[in-house]
Amino acid sequence: MGSQHSSALTFCQRKKDDNPEDLLADRDQEEAIAQFPYVEFTGRNSITCHTCQGAGYIPAEQVNELVALIPHSDQRLRPQRTKQYVLLSVLLCLLASGLVFFFLFPHSVLVDDNGIKVTKVTFNEQDSLVVLDVTATLKIRNSNFYPVAVTNLFSQVQYMKAVVGSYTTTNVSLIAPRSEHLVNFTVKAEVGGPSSYVYFYCTLPAIRVHNIVIFMRTSVKISYIGHISQSTLETQHYVDCGVNSTAAQSLFLVPRGPHL
């Protein structure tokens, strides 16, 4: 303990014996070093730092304008599970694309004949004509996951290869997704004439049932997602031209369609 105390006293005495001029010289040297500008040494010469302009600090207004340099070996530049995230993103994109393709891919729109429901018969004695108001029905089935529009319907009635009546209309109906819809329309047909036996046959009281065969060709245009298709049906029906009737019997059906 005695030796440590004596050495401490000796050190203090040496400090007191130091020359005050040496202490002033040391302070001047520290201040000179503190005022020395911040520079970058490239080996042969030095370049003043462009960021702080040698001041050793960054102005507050430039804090949001400067970019920090990160070493290439920094772990922040190597995110974990990158491959898993990329693979998951690719799978999700493929799944979404497949679902969009499945739901938006155009499916068939089926048009079927549902028969003749009502036949109204009137006679024109002056011109020897049998006037038939034929009400037919189409069954349209939409298999898509979006609505389709029936934009045009055209029907033509023939008897013995002669056109005796026609009907056309636009903006018929809008069919909901995955559903079917019945479309009714009435065609007026005039059969007979002065040189025809039809009027005599249909008005002959000795015959109980006055059946004639009419031929109908019906075309339907359907629009969906910028795509237009056309279906054509050709049917033949038995019609009693002597009296008004309902639910006329179909002879056979020849479907044609859809056509692009």
UniProtKB/Swiss-Prot annotation:
Protein's organism: Mus musculus
Domain of life, source organism: Eukaryota
Compartment(s): Endoplasmic reticulum membrane; Membrane
Keyword Isomerase attributed: no
Keyword entries, A-Z: Endoplasmic reticulum, Glycoprotein, Lipoprotein, Membrane, Myristate, Transmembrane, Transmembrane helix
Protein name in the entry: Transmembrane protein 106C
Positions of transmembrane segments: 85-105, 196-216
Gene field: Tmem106c
GO CC, alphabetical: endoplasmic reticulum membrane
